[in-house]
Structure formats: structure tokens, C-alpha cells
């Protein structure tokens, strides 16, 4: 399962602090869908390294989300990279690889299982972008027998931008971990 020559449990640590404003909505949409929110945000993403391994970028984004019967969720984001001077830009062209937008779909199969897919696109003539497929499964039960906030998180990623250091290399990555949700 783990081979030191080809596997690294913590190969990269990327940081992504952000600030956002979310406007809740309750608008009814066709076919039973509900528009749940819209928002705007500012995000900085960095790998925290020094040159020549340094990678970072800043962007602003618009987002929205809708749901159907608390079982299906569709969210979308469009972003614009904030310009940097050519001599301080760690990763020119990152938008052409990581993308300029994403669409996520989540399906709550039952109270213990959620399936998801996220698609990123450069929204340009190139065919770069990525796809991430995810499965989250509840682990155990919560306090006093209630719903557990712990999930086994399994993901398969294919495309560009899985990590900042390799943003311009196409990769396929299988991930397994634990997530905290609904706390």
C-alpha cells in the first residue's frame, strides 16, 4: 500500500485562507430545486515554500448554490486571478491549468453516505482542468448515539491543480482520509 519510492503520505501542504460574504436565499426554482445562497470571496492559496519551490496566487470569486430535497446539492464558482508583477509571479498561467471556475454536485445517498463530483475548467480553448470524485461515509456514532461528525473521505482526482507545486502537471491521485462535518 505504501511504497517510499513512489508514495508520500504528506507530499505537499497547501494553505488556502479566504474571506467571503454569503447571502442566504430561499427562492424556489423549477422542478423542486431551491436557490440557497450567493456570495463573493477573496482567497489566497500558497504552498508556504520559498523560491524556487514557492507557489501562490490570489483570486476573487462569485459563488452560488442550490439544492433539491436535502439530497442533491449543486454549487458553482467563477473566479478571476488578481494580477501580479511578472518578476514576482511564482506561477504564470496557473488559471490555464487550475481553471477559472468549478461546478460541484453532491448526492446524500442516505444519512451515512455522500457521493460528490467537482469539475474545474480553464473556460478557455485548452482542455485543461480537473475532475474530483468523492465518497464520504459516516464512521461510528456521535455522542449519546447521535449522528457522527466523522467521515471516512475517499477521493479520486485527475487533472491539473491537485497541489500548488504540480499545478501545471496532469496527475491522477487517490486519497484516503478523515473529515469532520456538520459540527
Q: Model features per residue range: what roles?
A:
Residues 15-17, 129-133, 176:
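One face of beta-strands
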Residues 1-113, 117-126, 156-160, 166-171:
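Outer-membrane pore/translocation modules
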Residues 116-150:
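Glycine/small-residue-rich hydrophobic helix-like segments
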Residues 61-63, 134, 151-153:
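Residue-level detection of beta-strand scaffold positions
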Residues 149-158, 162, 175-177:
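C-terminal membrane-adjacent module
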Residues 138, 142, 157-163, 181:
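Hydrophobic alpha-helical segments
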Residues 133-137, 154, 171-183:
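Outer-membrane beta-barrel "beta-signal"
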Amino acid at each position: 500500500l505504501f511504497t517510499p519510492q513512489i508514495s508520500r503520505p504528506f507530499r505537499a501542504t497547501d494553505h488556502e485562507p479566504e474571506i467571503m460574504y454569503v447571502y442566504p436565499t430561499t427562492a424556489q426554482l423549477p422542478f423542486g430545486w431551491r436557490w440557497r445562497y450567493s456570495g463573493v470571496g477573496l482567497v489566497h492559496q500558497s504552498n508556504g515554500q520559498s523560491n524556487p519551490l514557492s507557489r501562490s496566487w490570489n483570486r476573487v470569486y462569485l459563488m452560488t448554490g442550490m439544492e433539491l430535497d436535502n439530497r442533491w446539492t449543486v454549487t458553482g464558482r467563477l473566479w478571476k486571478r488578481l494580477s501580479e508583477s511578472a518578476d514576482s509571479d511564482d506561477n504564470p498561467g496557473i488559471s490555464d491549468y487550475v481553471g477559472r471556475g468549478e461546478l460541484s454536485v453532491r448526492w446524500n445517498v442516505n444519512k451515512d453516505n455522500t457521493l460528490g463530483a467537482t469539475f474545474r475548467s480553464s473556460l478557455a480553448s485548452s482542455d485543461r482542468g480537473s475532475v474530483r470524485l468523492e465518497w464520504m461515509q459516516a464512521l461510528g456514532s456521535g455522542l449519546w448515539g447521535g449522528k457522527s461528525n466523522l467521515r471516512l473521505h475517499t477521493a479520486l482526482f485527475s487533472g491539473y491543480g491537485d497541489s500548488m507545486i504540480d499545478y501545471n502537471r496532469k496527475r491522477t491521485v487517490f486519497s484516503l482520509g478523515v473529515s469532520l462535518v456538520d459540527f
